[in-house]
UniProtKB/Swiss-Prot annotation:
It is found in: Endosome, Multivesicular body membrane; Prevacuolar compartment membrane; Vacuole membrane. The keyword DNA-binding does not apply. It is a peripheral membrane protein. The keyword Protein transport applies. Pfam families: Fuz_longin_1 (PF19036), Fuz_longin_2 (PF19037), Fuz_longin_3 (PF19038). This is Vacuolar fusion protein mon1. Residues 1-13, 117-140 have a biased composition (Polar residues). Keywords: Autophagy, Endosome, Membrane, Protein transport, Transport, Vacuole. InterPro entries: FUZ/MON1/HPS1_longin_1, FUZ/MON1/HPS1_longin_2, FUZ/MON1/HPS1_longin_3, Mon1. It comes from the Eukaryota. Residues 101-113 have a biased composition (Basic and acidic residues). Residues 1-63, 93-140 are annotated as: Disordered.
Length: 630
């Protein structure tokens, strides 16, 4: 396989694809607060991105023939950076590594301040003895008076007096809520099959229309390729209407992006010979739905590759793509369902890592490097969808969107695990090179035995630990198998398997573990430089699929609003009847929090600053900074 490599891109916070994009303001729903005093320091820019790998140019926006495939334009990927490397030259402050796992935020006597400057003492490597702490944006533990230095406008502006209706409920500006828990519980159930006489067609169509979220993929000729609910024959009439609307705009030399019908939003993207459509009655923005459609398109490319897809339709525009995609429907469905349930990784365009000590992660990295074979391109250790370790060539990198596709295949669809202890899978990683296949060796570990035996198929997703070894050579199965065995032996010796097991059992910390007595129920924190995120454990407020969806709807609204066009805000606060939500965005990080609707603003501000300082203290445990290279 031919692939072109380039230096790994490193993201500057100002280049985050959402930071300048968005839509209209949410004046009716939200109150925004900007701190002018801190803006000068926070808006300093990092160096611009180096060029993206030239292979990404295959991901084109419009239809192209196979002859012009090398001239196609770049697809809008979910993120602009990789997780494998990051801004490793950012200054660090050294802190000693204790013996225990203390989740609580530390105390600092300095006044509250926020810094975005890179002009800090630099060290190219963190301490081998202890976990280092970034000082790029120092938010020490402070008292209320010092919090006001950053959140002065936020604390000064009080919400308008609440109004009471006949039911006695307080009428704050509120996000639209997802209605009924019982109704949402049936969202992922199949609608059934049409009988031979077609007598149940009306019933099936009613079930289809009751779904809150639909994804459709059809060809430029209007032929249904895949739909999340039902089948192309059952909903052919609706597909025809959508195709007619798209064609009307194309004939007018216009591009249909989205439209609304009542409370239903339709979003359309065209990629080559395919139209991808999202139909949603959930609270999601156009940008969020387009990002989900991009991921589905990348899932198709991971099966077919872009040259194959383009060639099929250039030879025969009415090609039925169902047969080439046979076996991939489950991957598309599980990916789509993760978006419907609510995916922090998709929302933030970032990956989550398993929290372990820096020295422990380094031991796993060293074991990967020590056992590396010549045919290895990438090596990953993944625990329940959370990245533990990655090894890569110095001038190659993995795109977060590619890793999300791999994690969906391995941990969500369950097709790989059902195949047994070892799997050998050809896969295209569109963010790396959309024109050819890589070959992936996957093996699961059984954490219940503290050994390298293959995992039992009954292990849950959170209990599943996968070793993923990727090569460009399709004959390298046995070489990678030998590497896996040697790597597991090394992890047995240095007790890395035990460490991973304990980290999984420990789980994510709760908000009260980090900030005792906090008013926060949950938070999401994204490190923009590392393109990774961390979050607290889900509490009782998110105990069901429906409640988790409502939480993610709140985050969707908050994220959409704070990243809206011309929304140059630092702090954003919204109060509804059910929640109080809070966003704090700087060039270095994004913090999103949810609390009860009557949460005190001062308490919100103090808790937010303590969450940020805790993340910075634990940075090299929470995130993979640099990774292992060879």
């Amino acid at each position: 396989m031919n692939s072109k490599a380039s230096e790994q891109p490193q993201v500057s916070p100002g280049d985050n694809e959402h930071a300048q994009d968005g839509s209209t303001s949410c004046a009716k729903n939200c109150a925004r607060y900007t701190n002018d005093d801190a803006s000068a320091a926070l808006e300093e820019r990092l160096p611009p991105l180096p060029p993206r790998p030239s292979t990404l140019s295959f991901l084109d926006e419009g239809y192209t023939s196979s002859r012009s495939i090398r001239q196609t334009s770049q697809v809008n990927l979910q993120a602009k950076a990789t997780t494998a490397v990051s801004l490793t030259d950012i200054g660090f402050r050294q802190s000693s590594e204790g013996d225990g796992e203390d989740h609580s935020a530390p105390d600092f006597p300095e006044p509250l301040r926020a810094k975005a400057s890179l002009n800090q003492p630099k060290t190219s490597k963190g301490s081998d003895a202890g976990d280092s702490t970034s000082i790029g944006s120092t938010i020490p533990n402070v008292e209320l008076g010092e919090v006001e230095n950053v959140f002065s406008d936020f604390l000064a502006a009080e919400p308008s007096a609440p109004q009471e209706d006949g039911s006695g409920l307080l009428q704050f500006p509120e996000f639209r809520a997802d209605d009924a828990e019982d109704e949402f519980a049936t969202e992922f159930e199949p609608i059934g099959d049409l009988n031979e006489q077609g007598e149940n067609e009306e019933l099936l169509l009613e079930r289809w229309k009751s779904k809150r979220k639909h994804y459709l993929i059809l060809s430029a000729a209007g032929k249904p390729i895949w739909t999340r609910h039902g089948d192309g024959g059952l909903i052919s009439g609706y597909v025809g209407v959508i195709q007619t609307i798209i064609s009307f705009y194309e004939d007018a030399k216009d591009h249909l992006s989205s439209f609304c019908a009542g409370d239903t939003k339709f979003v359309v993207i065209t990629r080559g010979p395919l139209h991808l459509v999202a139909i949603s009655r959930l609270h999601e923005s156009d940008t969020q739905l387009k990002s989900q459609l991009e991921a589905l398109y990348m899932q198709i490319l991971s099966t077919l590759t872009l040259p194959s897809l383009t060639h099929l339709f250039s030879v025969r525009p009415s090609t039925d793509l169902k047969r080439p995609l046979q076996g991939s429907e489950t991957l598309l469905s599980t990916l789509a369902d993760s978006f419907t349930k609510g995916s922090p990784s998709s929302l933030l365009s970032a990956l989550e890592c398993l929290k372990i000590r820096k020295s422990h992660r380094q031991a796993i990295n060293n074991a990967l490097l020590k056992t590396r074979v010549g045919s290895l391109l990438y090596g990953l250790v993944v625990a329940g969808g959370r990245l533990v370790s990655v090894v890569r060539p110095k001038k190659h990198s993995l795109h977060p969107g590619d890793l999300q596709l791999l994690f969906n295949m391995i941990f969500e669809a369950e097709g790989v695990k059902a195949g047994g202890g070892e799997n050998w899978i050809p896969v295209c990683l569109p963010g790396f090179n959309s024109s050819g296949y890589l070959y992936m060796y996957v093996s699961f570990l059984d954490l219940r035995e503290d050994s390298g035996s293959t995992a039992n198929e009954t292990a849950t997703k959170e209990e599943s630990v996968a070793i993923i070894l990727i090569s460009t050579k399709k004959e390298s199965f046995f070489e990678l198998q030998g590497m896996r065995n040697a790597f597991v032996e090394q992890m047995d010796k240095n007790e890395s398997i035990k460490i991973i097991k304990e980290a999984i059992k420990r789980g994510r910390p709760t908000t009260t573990d980090i900030v005792p007595g906090t008013v926060l129920h949950h938070f999401l924190y994204k490190s923009r430089a590392n393109v990774q995120f961390t979050m607290s454990a889900y509490g009782p407020e998110s105990s069901s699929t429906f409640r988790l969806r409502r939480l993610m709807s709140t985050y969707n609204d908050l994220h959409s609003s704070v990243h809206a066009k011309h929304a140059h805000v630092k702090v954003h606060h919204c109060v509804s009847q059910s929640t109080s939500s809070f966003a704090w965005v700087t060039p270095r990080f994004e913090l999103y929090c949810v609390a009860s609707p009557n949460a005190n603003r001062n308490a919100l501000a103090q808790s937010a600053s303590k969450i940020v300082q805790w993340v910075q203290q634990e940075e090299e445990r929470l995130f993979i900074i640099g990774g292992a290279v060879f």
